[in-house]
Amino acid sequence: MIAQVRTPRLLHQVASPLLSFSPLTPVEFPGTWSEGTYWVKLKLFGVLPIGRQAIVITYPQTENAQIFMLRDNGYSPLISKWDHLITAQEVNGGTLYRDSVTIKAGVLTPFVWLFARLFYAHRQRRWATLAANGFNYGNSQPL
């Protein structure tokens, strides 16, 4: 499961069809996230352009080697901070997965926060389905 978290393909799968991410810089997504900044174009429901965002990937170190962490400390012209920390830990034959998100968007923060709540609820449903199916992406094409 942790290997899946490292892939843009998983982001695409769990965000769809609510949000789509198209790479701008670099022009293609890597197979696995490397630390760095990835500019993307966002579309709501795959059709309505809602701007661009920087996905800023790091892999924070933790004292407990059993805990995996991936941070997207992203931002956009309207959202000064979209700090998303994923932690995952193998526990009793399963995986304990957590999302933590901090958002700052000035006067737009309440609206962005509401959208984020809806988006992460959607992601969690999609995650659960994928995990239950052994991360079988079906006919979706790799990014």
Where are these regions (language model features)?
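Beta-strand/loop substructures that line and gate deep hydrophobic ligand-binding cavities in soluble
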Residues: L70-R117
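A conserved amphipathic terminal alpha-helix motif
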Residues: T102-L143
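Short amphipathic beta-strand and strand-loop transition segments with alternating hydrophobic
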Residues: F21-G31, T58-P60, L85-Q89
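A generic structural micro-feature
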Residues: T32, V47-P49, S76-S80
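Hydrophobic ligand-binding cavity/cleft-lining segments
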Residues: M1-E35
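Surface-exposed, charged secondary-structure patches
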Residues: K41-L44, A54, Y59
